[in-house]
């Protein structure tokens, strides 16, 4: 599949950008910093797909036709947290670390973002062998794959975006792990009871998740919420508290916060 890649100078903060992109159901993008320290937004349009409306007045810095492999080619294997390696090259053969192979699908969700890194950090810390885990808003499926490789007995990964679901399925197959991947608007298509719920999405969407998460958890379940901008942390914590969830731990990288919750 070929994409049109458009590059913009990022004019707004990352939180506002993500909200606008997600509101329009747009998930194929990457945020990066160039050598001059400028923040750039790269968006990838499929054939027939239109640009998010708020970008129509932004100046295009660069434009080209590309394939997913083109934008992944510069990524080298890297250790997302201690002993967990993300490998877009499929060249890593070592067996002393957990290795996650990623297919060149969507640009967002390679593991480079601090919200993904913090989520993996807490998965390593709180996931117990034999746990049942659900990854809500799975993107490329990286968190679900890590959970399975950490020893979870059953893992489900869900996302509202059909392309993300297809990419996650491809990555699950590439890693030879048993993970159920399906399209779902948060927990609408999720049944059963889970020991750990991990979700790397926007703060406002966490509020919706908290309305329904009790249905699929028990009194000892762990809830990992990532993708929260620090200015909206209290909003999420207050909602969680009202729903009977207490804070166990938090971690912050730059403006991004990840919370670990347990039932009170």
Swiss-Prot record:
It is an enzyme of class 2 (transferase). InterPro entries: Ribosomal_L11_MeTrfase_PrmA, Ribosomal_PrmA_MeTrfase, SAM-dependent_MTases_sf. GO terms for cellular component: cytoplasm. Keywords: Cytoplasm, Methyltransferase, S-adenosyl-L-methionine, Transferase. It comes from the Bacteria. It catalyses: L-lysyl-[protein] + 3 S-adenosyl-L-methionine = N(6),N(6),N(6)-trimethyl-L-lysyl-[protein] + 3 S-adenosyl-L-homocysteine + 3 H(+). It is found in: Cytoplasm. Gene3D superfamilies: Vaccinia Virus protein VP39 (3.40.50.150). S-adenosyl-L-methionine binds at residues 116, 137, 159, 200. Pfam families: PrmA. Its EC number is 2.1.1.-. GO terms for molecular function: protein-lysine N-methyltransferase activity. GO terms for biological process: methylation. Methylates ribosomal protein L11. Belongs to the methyltransferase superfamily. PrmA family. HAMAP family: Methyltr_PrmA (MF_00735). This is Ribosomal protein L11 methyltransferase.
